[in-house]
Every structure is written in structure tokens, then in C-alpha cells.
Regions:
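Preference for intrinsically disordered or flexible, low-complexity segments
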Residues: 1-407
Length: 407
């Protein structure tokens, strides 16, 4: 992105945020006093390497980050324009998924998925789109999908899964892209007739990464034309050939109340080491760049909350009255900025919040043009409506640091 383009984009983002301030008082029922209090129970999410890789397969209903998604409905996964970045047109990358069933019969199994484009350039343009009030066709680089199933369904037993490697799901899944292991492999290599891709982009990347050499060998070893990967066995173990996927973690949960007890200064120091190692070089400059006391106050409250459990990467709310903790006062949505459900027209509520600490575990470089965010807050249909579409679009609000610091 050239300097002039960056400058124009920063000016537009600042103008949009300033225009939104007038709406904030009218629609946002969060005032300074409310920010000091949190009444609703919150569940914290932490990432850890799984003890057993098989535990992250779809039949175990995992909450996980990085790697490839474990599709709840393995057949009818998002396709066509749903799985690409609306800004650059490239397939989105899997960020994380959260298993969050409800008491509703239609949501006995319920999973939310978050995908995003790894390009910071696209995320900045996503900000421009985000500030538009409910466009007819939003252009986003961050997308959220909700999938839910009844207890009796074609894919899983009605009984609790047996946590051993021999437990298998009931039924096959769609054939996936051999490069990303994420999206449907609708495109077939015209030479070997075995390797599948979700897009021309991934086919080119795979060819350059080694399929050019492997393709003739595949033709010799598999002379019968047509892919034979129609069964579940290959699909369930598919991890994708791309080396650019984020590393795979299990998301474990704990109640925030466990961390609300007073900590000694020694414990505070030891518990803060991870976040400080990640942020010391950048947080001071970001803090100094804040415009006015409101941002500094929000940042201080945010840090105080995070310091109780600095390794947390996710905060789960799922309550109509829940409010996320915003690192910055600027760039927050008003109530009017949160759309209504696209399927039932009902209200959406805050489901969970993804913290920037996740980038540390993903090993994302701390460079000027590297992917970065201050917070990603996911809003989902309050009623968790059971529209006929297997994967329903939900809404993500991304707060980045001041545009000037994000660049």
C-alpha cells in the first residue's frame, strides 16, 4: 500500500470514527460508570497444545484455534463467495471455533467459526466497510459462521462421544482443498486428477510449493482418473498442505471468577511475564499515541482486567446484558452499529471476544505491516434462530489500535 493510499485510508477511518461519536450517546447505553463494573459471569479461553491430536476432530466437538476447522456439518460447508475475503478475493484463513450449545432443541450442538484474511491491508479496508451503517452487501475480511444441529442428526450419535481414538463420526464429509484443508475442493488438478483445490489461488500456490514435481508421480501411482477421496477416512485426518496455516491449539476454558482473588505482587509479576514479553516493545508507544484521556482510561481498565489472567485469548459472554471490555474508547460500536439478525431480524448479542494475545501464540511477527488488532467482538443472533441455511453469517466488530499506530 503506497504512502498516499495509507494516508487517505487513515483520514477516512478517523472521519468515520469522529462521525460515530454523535451516535454513541444516543444508542450506546454504556457509560463511564458501567465500564467499571462487570456483573455477568464470564468464561475465559486459553490455548494449549492438545495431548492427543484426534481430540480436535469434529466428532469431539472441539473449541480450537489455528490449523483447520472441525466442521460441525461436514457436508454443507460455506462455499462460493462466502469463503473469500471480500476485499482481495482470496480464501479466508481459519482463526478459531467455539463450541457453544444452548438449551434449545435445535441447538443441541452449536458451533461458531471465525475466519479472517491474514492481510493487514485488507483488515484496514475492512475497517472502512465496518463503519458503514448496515450496507446491503457488506465487504468484510473477517467473517463469522454459526452452525447448529439437533441431538438427532445425520452426523453424530445421540450419546456422548467416547474420548478415544477409535470413536468415529457417523457419515462422510465434503472433499476438502488439499492446500488449505478448510474449504470444499471443487477444483480438480487437470493432470493427476487426484489433487483438489478450493480456488485457483491455492492451486497455483500448491503447484509452486511442490505439486509441479509430485503431480507426475501421483499420475503413475494412481492411474485411475478421478479423485478417490470420497470417504470420511481421508477427510477426517486432512490437515492441508499449506505451511501458512496458523499453528493448531486446543481452547480450554476456566471461569474468570477463579482469577478475581487478590494476587500478591510476586504472583502479579510472574503472571504478567507472557504478556509483557509480547508487548513491552510496542505497548508504550501505542499508549503514548492515544488521543486524550478517554483512550488511556479504557486501556488502563482493559489491562487491569487482562492482567488477572494474561494468557487468556478469548472471553466468552453469551448474555444479552454482557458487554465486552474495549481496549480503546474510540472505535467502539454504538448499539446502532450492531445489525439485526439477517435471518429472523431479531437482535444480536455479544457472544465472545478474541484478544490480541492470540497473535503471540500464532507466532505472528510484530512488524509494521503484520496482522494486528486490539479486539474482535463476535455478535450472534440472540435467539440462535434455526434458519434453513446450514452455516449462518453472524457479525464481528474489529477494533484496531489508532489507525496511525496500526499502520
Amino acid at each position: 500500500m503506497d504512502t498516499d493510499a495509507i494516508g487517505d485510508l487513515v483520514d477516512k477511518l478517523k472521519a468515520m470514527q469522529n462521525d460515530n461519536v454523535e451516535d454513541q450517546d444516543e444508542y450506546d447505553d454504556v457509560d463511564d460508570d458501567d465500564e467499571e463494573e462487570e456483573h455477568e459471569p464470564i468464561t475465559l479461553g486459553f490455548v494449549d497444545k492438545p495431548k492427543n491430536k484426534w481430540s480436535l476432530q469434529r466428532q469431539y466437538f472441539p473449541s480450537k484455534a489455528g490449523g483447520v476447522p472441525a466442521w460441525l456439518d461436514p457436508l454443507n460447508i460455506p462455499s462460493r463467495g462466502s469463503f473469500v475475503c471480500d476485499i482481495c478475493g482470496e480464501p479466508l484463513q481459519f482463526l478459531l471455533q467455539v463450541y457453544a450449545p444452548t438449551e434449545q432443541e435445535t441447538a443441541f450442538h452449536r458451533m461458531l467459526y471465525v475466519f479472517m484474511c491474514p492481510s493487514m491491508k485488507c483488515l484496514l479496508r475492512d475497517q472502512h466497510e465496518q463503519w458503514k451503517h448496515h450496507p446491503e452487501k457488506p465487504s468484510r475480511s473477517v467473517k463469522v459462521f454459526r452452525c447448529q444441529l439437533q441431538r438427532v442428526n445425520p452426523f453424530y450419535s445421540q450419546e456422548c462421544p467416547q474420548y478415544n481414538e477409535s470413536h468415529k463420526p457417523a457419515g462422510c464429509g465434503a472433499v476438502l482443498c488439499d492446500w488449505c484443508g478448510t474449504w470444499k475442493g471443487d477444483k480438480l488438478c487437470s493432470s493427476c486428477r487426484q489433487t483438489r483445490y478450493c480456488s485457483e489461488k491455492h492451486q497455483v500456490m500448491s503447484w509452486r510449493a511442490g505439486h509441479k514435481i509430485a503431480c507426475p508421480q501421483i499420475q503413475i501411482s494412481s492411474p485411475v482418473s478421478g479423485s478417490n477421496k470420497s470417504g470420511a477416512t481421508l477427510l477426517e485426518s486432512h490437515k492441508g498442505g499449506s505451511k501458512n496455516l496458523w499453528p493448531e491449539f486446543e481452547i480450554t476454558i476456566e471461569d474468570e471468577s477463579e482469577y478475581n482473588r487478590d494476587m500478591s505482587e510476586e504472583n502479579k509479576l510472574s503472571n504478567s511475564l507472557i504478556s509483557r514479553n509480547r508487548t513491552d516493545d510496542t505497548m508504550n508507544s501505542i499508549f503514548d499515541s492515544f488521543q486524550g484521556d478517554a483512550d488511556k482510561k479504557s486501556w488502563a481498565s482493559f489491562q487491569e482486567c487482562i492482567d488477572k489472567a494474561p494468557e487468556q485469548v478469548l472471553r466468552y459472554y453469551r448474555n444479552t446484558n454482557a458487554k465486552p471490555i474495549w481496549p480503546l474508547s474510540s472505535g467502539r460500536p454504538s448499539n446502532a452499529d450492531i445489525p439485526r439478525c439477517s435471518y429472523c431480524s431479531g437482535p444480536m448479542c455479544c457472544e465472545f471476544q478474541i484478544l490480541p494475545q492470540l497473535l503471540y501464540y500464532f507466532g505472528v511477527d510484530n512488524e509494521v505491516d503484520s496482522l494486528d488488532w486490539a479486539s474482535i467482538v463476535v455478535y450472534a443472533c440472540e435467539a440462535s434462530c434455526n434458519a434453513s441455511l446450514p452455516y449462518k453469517h453472524e457479525f464481528a466488530w474489529v477494533q484496531i489500535h489508532s489507525p496511525s499506530t496500526a499502520l
